[in-house]
Amino acid sequence: MSSGRIIQIIGAVIDVEFERTSVPKIYDALQVDGTETTLEVQQQLGDGVVRTIAMGSTEGLKRGLTVTSTNAPISVPVGTATLGRIMDVLGRPIDEAGPVATEERLPIHRQAPSYAEQAASTDLLETGIKVIDLLCPFAKGGKVGLFGGAGVGKTVNMMELINNIAKAHSGLSVFAGVGERTREGNDFYHEMKDSNVLDKVAMVYGQMNEPPGNRLRVALTGLTMAEYFRDEKDENGKGRDVLLFVDNIYRYTLAGTEVSALLGRMPSAVGYQPTLAEEMGVLQERITSTKSGSITSIQAVYVPADDLTDPSPATTFAHLDATVVLSRDIASSGIYPAIDPLDSTSRQLDPLVVGQEHYEIARAVQNVLQRYKELKDIIAILGMDELAEEDKLVVYRARKIQRFFSQPFHVAEVFTGAPGKLVPLKETIRGFKGLLAGEYDHIPEQAFYMVGGIDEVIAKAEKL
């Protein structure tokens, strides 16, 4: 165990001097003697000096303090003892429920599975949310991004997905809260506790108030726990299907930007770190399915200033199988979930995967909505009366489709008072098929708003 001393502190960046013969390796964890502070080596500056980033607050540190090298990367507890617990970036419990009872630990920096070990899957994961199941279906073992600006419902959508998938899915889940609000983390904990699935979820939080080093590594901590669950073999030699929720992947990038500037790297476009694509790749390449088990990940992605071409969301796009884009325009018109049916995509929306009927209905729905979008300008200038009869029909159907995409959520029940609805895929397809065929042309459009399946629409219309 080599030891050195602190020679410089600039915010979260600390320079430590070691003997030239015992300089720690990149990503080794160092412990500041007499404190709880852990440092991670980022650069070797020469002459025995290493530049490190602190994984916690640097308050109370001063030059000359002794630092001991652990000669290993940061490692965190893994296995079933982590379930039902809330941990920080170093795997220390922060839920005041005693230590995490496991001897097994893994380093947070690991290689992604090789090409030979990876396996793709086309099994669909039903979410019970109509617009997602119809237009951007999720794959088991796939990666999904929820893109949206501030306040359009990323976290609520993610909570509903957790509610619908994690509860129905008997497997294990890991939730990584990266640079988000502590209140949301607290809500999530109580939500899981109340629905009796807490014993199947491990939670890792590095929230907004944490230093950048902490927020930069907390996603890797959560991922390491998920990888262990995926790779742990049962008696038949099979791994597990694990769910990994990350809220919010943008804050991971942002923490990287803060660290990069502190380390003195030249910024690239829009002030992001020059290693943006590589850092994102290091995380995303590890979130994958192998021949023995799978990780299905759902990631919230904050979109700065609602600009999808910003380097951070643009880099994230490349790694995903399905993208769910939340739109401010749709949210402002009162339709929730505010998912943009024309912008959201999925690699699974293919007749060979979802079947010919589902594919054709999804594309027909998008065609109607696209035509309505084109007609909006004409309507704004000339009014509805100037449209051809068939265009009027398109408009009426499109407005019904838009309203039918809205759906009351279980997690929003406390705010709206409307009980949440979970719609099976077969019901969703049946409803939209009838809508396109004109079977419900006689029903007023308000009957389609905030309901579950098509049978509820008919029942609601009778009361109007």
From Swiss-Prot:
Reactions catalysed: ATP + H2O + 4 H(+)(in) = ADP + phosphate + 5 H(+)(out)
Transmembrane intervals: none
UniProt EC number: 7.1.2.2
Keyword Kinase: no
PROSITE patterns, sorted: ATPASE_ALPHA_BETA
Binding site for ATP: G148, G149, A150, G151, V152, G153, K154, T155
Top-rank lineage group of the source organism: Bacteria
InterPro entries (alphabetical): AAA+_ATPase, ATP-synt_VA_C, ATP_synth_F1_bsu, ATPase_a/bsu_AS, ATPase_alpha/beta_chains, ATPase_F1/V1/A1_a/bsu_N, ATPase_F1/V1/A1_a/bsu_N_sf, ATPase_F1/V1/A1_a/bsu_nucl-bd
Main location (coarse class): membrane
Subcellular location: Cell inner membrane
Entry GO terms, CC: plasma membrane; proton-transporting ATP synthase complex
Gene3D superfamilies noted in UniProt: 2.40.10.170, Bovine Mitochondrial F1-atpase, Atp Synthase Beta Chain, Chain D, domain 3 (1.10.1140.10), P-loop containing nucleotide triphosphate hydrolases (3.40.50.300)
Pfam family, one: ATP-synt_ab
Alphabetized UniProt keyword annotations: ATP synthesis, ATP-binding, Cell inner membrane, Cell membrane, CF(1), Hydrogen ion transport, Ion transport, Membrane, Nucleotide-binding, Translocase, Transport
Topological type in the membrane: Peripheral membrane protein
Molecular function in Gene Ontology: ATP binding; ATP hydrolysis activity; proton-transporting ATP synthase activity, rotational mechanism
Family the UniProt entry places it in: Belongs to the ATPase alpha/beta chains family.
Function of the protein: Produces ATP from ADP in the presence of a proton gradient across the membrane. The catalytic sites are hosted primarily by the beta subunits.
Summary of subunit composition and partner proteins: F-type ATPases have 2 components, CF(1) - the catalytic core - and CF(0) - the membrane proton channel. CF(1) has five subunits: alpha(3), beta(3), gamma(1), delta(1), epsilon(1). CF(0) has three main subunits: a(1), b(2) and c(9-12). The alpha and beta chains form an alternating ring which encloses part of the gamma chain. CF(1) is attached to CF(0) by a central stalk formed by the gamma and epsilon chains, while a peripheral stalk is formed by the delta and b chains.
Protein name: ATP synthase subunit beta
